[in-house]
Amino acid sequence: MSKTDWNASGLSRPSPSAHWPSRKLWQHGQKYQTTQDRSEPPAGKRRQAVRVSANHASQQLDQLKAVHLASAVRDLERAMTTLKLWESPQEISRHQALGYSVIMFMITAVKRLRESKMLTLSWFNQALMVIAPSQEETMNLKTAMWILANLIPRDMLSLTGDLLPSLWGSGLLMLKLQKEGRSTSS
């Protein structure tokens, strides 16, 4: 069908149903603009699209990290349950007299991570205030949190709150705290 169709209003005018590729008239030697050329955004908008896709990629990476963290927490929970079962009866009776052991603190922290996905410094300070009279329990809590900080992969620590990232890699600090704990309990 040609562009100059028969029309009721006039013979020489083009039909309104005929769609032209662009508002400019085509001239001899000039190539038509393709739909791909027309749909390409200007340079300024192209940068915006990259920012949006980078943000989307970042969100996907965070979601992937959250899934891996949930898997790591489940694995830790299974490991803590196994450790609890392996404790000897002598250690269990000693822990009952003492209160909380390192394993018990780790179990508590892993449960908190599973439920709220956060271990914060304020939670840690509250736990320290509750067990303040017992130097050994305080040392057990610090040791448990340090072990957790080193068991969870480093790239996922930022998703767990502010406690574990601050404890990660502070091995020298833990050795110093353990020496202080031994010297005060002797």
UniProtKB/Swiss-Prot annotation:
<comment type="subunit">
    <text>Interacts with the phosphoprotein (via C-terminus); this interaction allows C to associate with the ribonucleocapsid.</text>
</comment>
<dbReference type="Pfam" id="PF02725">
    <property type="entry name" value="Paramyxo_NS_C"/>
</dbReference>
<feature type="region of interest" description="Disordered">
    <location>
        <begin position="1"/>
        <end position="44"/>
    </location>
</feature>
<comment type="function">
    <text>Ribonucleocapsid-associated protein that interacts with the phosphoprotein (P), thereby increasing replication accuracy and processivity of the polymerase complex.</text>
</comment>
<keyword id="KW-1048">Host nucleus</keyword>
<dbReference type="GO" id="GO:0044161">
    <property type="term" value="C:host cell cytoplasmic vesicle"/>
</dbReference>
<feature type="compositionally biased region" description="Polar residues">
    <location>
        <begin position="1"/>
        <end position="15"/>
    </location>
</feature>
<dbReference type="GO" id="GO:0042025">
    <property type="term" value="C:host cell nucleus"/>
</dbReference>
<dbReference type="InterPro" id="IPR003875">
    <property type="entry name" value="Paramyxovir_NSC"/>
</dbReference>
<comment type="similarity">
    <text>Belongs to the morbillivirus protein C family.</text>
</comment>
<keyword id="KW-1036">Host cytoplasmic vesicle</keyword>
<protein>
    <recommendedName>
        <fullName>Protein C</fullName>
    </recommendedName>
</protein>
